[in-house]
Amino acid sequence: MRAACRGWRWNASDARHGLLVADKFRALYKRPTVLGVRVAQQIHEVCRPLAPLLGIWRGSGSGHYSTINDFAYVEEVVFDHVGKPFFAYSQKTKNPINGQPLHAERGYLRVINDREVEMVIAQPTGIVEILAGYYAANSDACVINFESTEVAMTATAKTVAEVTRVIRLENNEMLYDVSMAAMGQSMQHHLSATLQRVAK
């Protein structure tokens, strides 16, 4: 190494080149992040029809079921991407009166082709939903229908047999409905909410 470097002198041209390289690295690492992961600038081609989902959504919803009292909640949903053929999904809700945390879940929306989607959602209640479905979309709207193909539960989780989810989006407004068969009850409506996009 010393022999290779002998006689080398730093000059203005080298300095300019070094600054150009540094600028390129800074530009690369200034990309936005999702949960600490740098986000690719381009959405994966197969995900582009569902690009209207991307962003931060906030609003309110309500829930009911035959085994519990009716309730209300405020909610934040985030769909984001890292340039691969899926969207990352996170959701959290709070009590609208005292702000205490309620439900939360995280998962991935996997786009299979121009009609089919899959989704996996994990919940801190010990439940994991595996869903499959279909979608229709245009430049600013989409509808997605999911049905569970499997619901996995930890040993202490409440029993859930089946789940359906419907997501509708148009004009920066997202509406969804969730139905389920749980705790020995037949399939029935459980949740609905209306959210507005607050950031892309």
Where do the language-model regions lie?
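Tryptophan (W) side chains
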Residues: 8-10
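Short hydrophobic alpha-helical segments enriched in small aliphatic residues
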Residues: 12-18
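Amphipathic/hydrophobic helical signal segments and adjacent flexible N-terminal regions
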Residues: 30-86, 92-101, 164, 171-172, ...
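Short hydrophobic/aromatic-rich beta-strand segments that constitute the beta-sheet cores
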Residues: 59, 87-91, 117-121, 143-148, ...
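Helix-adjacent hinge/juxtasegments
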Residues: 96-134
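Acidic, glycine-rich flexible loop segments
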Residues: 126-127, 144-164
